[in-house]
Amino acid sequence: MIVAVVLSAGESSRMGRAKALLPIEGQTFIERIVGALKQGGIERIIVVLGFNAEEIRRQIVGLPVEILVNTQYKLGQLSSLQVALRHLDADKSCAGTMVHLVDHPYIDPKLVKLMVQRFDESAYSIVVPRHQGKRGHPVIFSRKLFGALLGAPMDQGAKAVVNAHRDATLEIDAEDAGITLDIDTPELYRQHVKGD
């Protein structure tokens, strides 16, 4: 089983408000992401919160997710992923994790399904989508790499693990540019969301 981990612990300093709660197409970013993951066949979803955790938790109380809180969120995204990996370590049914970022709301359920299928059918340890040569999110990491992710340098993040395992990485071409769209400023939000 692939468990999705949505990283939503940052301070959103450039955006000025919690990205998880930003409206998009009648939902919030986090609702849209969780819905797409569910439609893509992901049964178990963990959301890692940090800054403003209680405020966000109150707003997403009805979502079918497990909530973890990273009290060390200032260390960066990798620290939030590590909180989830430690939580999953004892769950032997977890074959890997699909990591997604809350500021990437344009996630395609068909791509989610395809990525899991390709992961299950292959011996690759990492599955990453690519649009016009540029990699995006979500990214699947095999359980075999949990140790490497837990030991990766904080300043390099999960990219250090991807770079160290290039031969074990499968890239999947994605038609949707949304996989690379990181909406982390008010300007990008107005351009890509409010201008839908």
Regions found by a protein language model. Give the residues of each.
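Short aromatic/basic micro-patch
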Residues: 23, 106, 139-140, 171, ...
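Conserved beta-strand segments of alpha/beta enzyme cores
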Residues: 20, 66, 125, 168-170, ...
